[in-house]
Amino acid sequence: MSRRSPKLELKLNLSPPTSSQRRMVRSPSRSATTSPTSPPSSCVSSEMNQDEPSVRYSTSPETTSMVLVGCPRCLMYVMLSEDDPKCPKCKSTVLLDFLHENATNANANAAAASSGRKTRRN
């Protein structure tokens, strides 16, 4: 970037995950030795079985989906849990989910219709 052209263009190209990739959890390779500072129940200190595949499917109820959203108030993109989507900076719940735009618009239209307000159709 030079002083004559301070304009910087960045593009983020993301595609929605396929249904087979949504429940897939990748585990990083772990050390076979335990650290003295890690508790024995820590995932860092647990040993990885050589016969165990490195890709596992999660059946745990604690695993939540993540969504990539934009906050119109802070003008930033963040990746958040789908269960509790709030902007980490301003705590706003008004977020733009651009990967699932059609589902979000359908939910917004249904909520507006149930509250008695009219929505503008495109």
Swiss-Prot record:
Principal location: nucleus
**Variant or mutagenesis effect after changing L12S:** Abolishes repressor activity and interaction with TPL
Q: Which InterPro entries match?
A: GIR1-2/SIED1 (IPR055281), Zn-ribbon_GIR1 (IPR056440)
Question: What biological processes does GO assign it?
Answer: negative regulation of DNA-templated transcription; root hair cell development
* Knockout-associated phenotype: No visible phenotype under normal growth conditions, but the double mutant seedlings gir1 and gir2 exhibit excessive root hair formation.
**One Pfam family in the UniProt entry:** Zn-ribbon_GIR1
Q: Which keywords does the record carry?
A: Nucleus, Repressor, Transcription, Transcription regulation
Q: In which domain of life is the source organism classified? A: Eukaryota
Q: Localized where? A: Nucleus
- Spans annotated as Disordered: 1-62
Polar residues: compositionally biased ranges: 47-62
Q: Where is the composition biased (Low complexity)?
A: 27-46
Basic and acidic residues bias locations? 1-10
Q: What is a single cellular component term in the Gene Ontology annotation?
A: nucleus
Q: Where is this motif: EAR?
A: 7-12
Where in the body, by tissue, does this protein show up? Expressed in root and shoot meristems.
State what this protein does: Acts as a negative regulator of root hair development redundantly with GIR2. GIR1 and GIR2 may function as adapter proteins that associate with GL2 and participate in the control of root hair formation. GIR1 and GIR2 may function as adapter proteins that associate with TPL and participate in the repression of root gene expression.
Record text on subunit structure and interactions: Interacts with GL2. Interacts with TPL.
Question: Anything else of interest in the record?
Answer: Seedlings overexpressing GIR1 exhibit reduced root hair formation.
The name under which this protein is listed is Protein GL2-INTERACTING REPRESSOR 1
**Organism, per UniProt?**
Arabidopsis thaliana
Task: Report which gene this protein is encoded by.
Answer: GIR1
